[in-house]
Design a protein with these regions (language model features):
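A general structural motif
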Residues: 32-34, 88, 134
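A glycine/threonine-rich phosphate-anchoring loop and its flanking beta-alpha core
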Residues: 21, 111-164
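Conserved beta-strand elements of the Class I
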Residues: 36-37, 90-92, 138
């Protein structure tokens, strides 16, 4: 049997020293006027993170850092609540795999009305999502290895069953 496939991963990647200074411009280009900056508690306390947040000061930036190293659904729910309460219209996910995964899922869930688990990466469950309810997301990886910045999925633990 001959297999044919097409692969399209239209993720724009910027890299190089000092590129974080472009965050405000990247947000504006993505239509984000009030970004929610999502990171983990350890990174939130570092000068490089403060500098990244300060680069967004001209925008209505908020910060969310209530993320466990192996994120759980309550981390996502808390982030979605902060996003909605602050009227944020996009996400800047900053950190390693956990922060990037939570940031992506917060952006995905921003305008959804169904529970997060209705969108597991199983079969065609993704078709249940309202595409208009997905906020734009900008991922800034601070580690190498997970590739979360270019993937569509986020690994989140369901607290009731302890499954991912």
């Amino acid at each position: 049997m001959t297999q044919k496939a097409n692969w399209n991963y239209p993720t724009s990647v910027r890299f190089g020293a000092g590129r974080v200074a472009e965050l405000a411009d990247v947000c504006k280009a993505a239509g984000i006027a009030r970004p929610l900056f999502v990171t983990d508690p350890g990174l939130a306390a570092l000068p490089m993170t403060r500098a990244a947040v300060e680069s967004l000061n001209g925008l209505g930036v908020g910060v969310f850092s209530e993320i466990k190293s192996n994120p759980v659904e309550s981390n996502v729910a808390a982030g979605v609540a902060v996003l909605r309460a602050g009227k944020h219209d996009g996400v800047v996910a900053f950190g390693g795999g956990s922060a990037l995964d939570v940031g992506k899922v917060i952006a995905f869930m921003a305008g959804q009305t169904r529970p997060m688990w209705d969108f597991e990466d199983v079969g065609d469950w993704w078709t249940r999502a309202d595409p208009k309810g997905i906020a734009p997301v900008i991922a800034v990886p601070t580690t190498s290895g997970t590739g979360s910045e270019v993937g569509r999925a986020g690994v989140i633990t369901q607290e009731a069953t302890h499954t991912k």
